[in-house]
Amino acid sequence: LVKTGISYVSEKGAAENLKAELSGWNFEQVRLDAKAAWNKSLSVFQFESKDSIAKQQFYTALYHTQIAPSLFNDVSGEYRGADGKIHKNNGFTPYTIFSLWDTYRAAHPLYTLTDENVADYANSMLAIQQQQGTMPVWHLAGNETGTMVGYHSIPVVVDAYLKGFKISEDKVWDAIKGFKDYNDLGLRDNRNQDYISAEKEPWSVAKGIEYAIDSYSIAKFAQKTD
């Protein structure tokens, strides 16, 4: 058997994580614990059907929604921020893997019904904004890939705020101001001429539609906090 510790901070952090999470060598116990943990996590829904295939498809899809976001800090509370510096979790638990164009429509609204970590997800995005100057677009392991259409951390955070999760109103406004000043990915043209030129930007129509959704979420937040 081989055990591996993972840390985005240090080798010491990886060793401490491994010791805290898996100190023994009982493979069968680890398997049983993992099975029990997944059964508990998937039990947020009770799906009743005589169609066994439909039931399998439902719980497989639910399982897929729970693969990410992923916990990002060491057991010490340290994590590597979007600025490359080591930070300590302060009032929230940091997460990563925010594939937001894929998840903002359905997965994140689902999390507000089923996932106790929603505030941590939102506060992780707000911390990323403070560290790199912009909200995440497609954030992976402390790094911004910038490979998705839209600026969909905004509607995710606004949705969580409007549903009563513990999120700083001031930090949400800071994030919105960052969106207003962000000029990449066609946003400058979208702001200045109300459309995105296909000659200048790929996926121009898709981006225009997605930015309209982002702007609508900003309007809803403003109505709530005005």
What residues fall within each predicted segment?
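Acidic/polar, glycine-enriched structural segments that form the non-catalytic walls/loops
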Residues: 1-95, 127, 134-137, 166, ...
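Hydrophobic alpha-helical scaffolding
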Residues: 24-28, 48-52, 96, 112, ...
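Active-site cavity-forming subdomains of large catalytic enzyme subunits
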Residues: 117-124, 129-225
